Amino acid sequence: MAREAKGPKEGDFITIKSYKHDGSLHRTWRDTMVLKTSENVLIGCNDHTLVTEDDGRRWVTREPAIVYFHKHYWFNIVAMIRDNGVSYYCNLASPYVLDKEALKYIDYDLDVKVFPDGERRLLDVDEYEEHGAQWRYSADTDRILKANVKVLVDWIKNKKGPFSQDYIDIWYSRYQELSRRQ
């Protein structure tokens, strides 16, 4: 008897769904190309990907972006490849789960934006505090998220993983190679 595939393979397209802590759907990305999967990591690429907001508004991403998700870290990383360099949008979020429908995670509002010149900004602190009170984030969740902000800032400072230009070059090149095969 043939073994059932364990999830998406390199070159497959998946949907990504982010939810809020209360379980409501926040945002959906259609057709993210999978570049790599391992036990704990999924790397993909969005390129002119359709995004649907919770209110039904739709828009298309403007540039290619390498996306990084991990099953143990409470953040995911979007590296947007632009003419003036790579910009990063890092979501503080639950580790992802992957099922037949989509890659899914809970978005916890806090974001770190990194500009091509290295400037960093922590965004949406007010939204995090508002939702934390509204949905009663536990003390453990708050502690874990704040600890993961520190991990994320350390990765940024040390150009670890997605924050390395070599990493971006390797995975964007792989995306281009797989796109030519489609």
From Swiss-Prot:
CC cofactor: Mg(2+)
Binding site for Mg(2+) 2: 109, 111, 124, 127
Pfam family, one: DUF402
First-level EC class: hydrolase
Highest taxon, organism lineage: Bacteria
UniProt keyword annotations, A-Z: Hydrolase, Magnesium, Metal-binding
InterPro entries with a match to the protein in the record: DUF402 (IPR007295), FomD-like_sf (IPR035930), Ntdp-like (IPR050212), SA1684 (IPR016882)
Catalytic reaction list: a ribonucleoside 5'-triphosphate + H2O = a ribonucleoside 5'-diphosphate + phosphate + H(+); a ribonucleoside 5'-diphosphate + H2O = a ribonucleoside 5'-phosphate + phosphate + H(+)
Keyword field contains Metal-binding: yes
Gene3D superfamilies from the UniProt entry: FomD-like (2.40.380.10)
EC number: 3.6.1.15, 3.6.1.6
PANTHER family: PTHR39159, UPF0374 PROTEIN YGAC
NCBIfam families tied to this protein: PRK13662.1
Task of the protein: Has nucleoside phosphatase activity towards nucleoside triphosphates and nucleoside diphosphates.
Membership in a protein family: Belongs to the Ntdp family.
Descriptive protein name: Nucleoside triphosphate/diphosphate phosphatase
Lineage: Bacteria, Bacillati, Bacillota, Bacilli, Lactobacillales
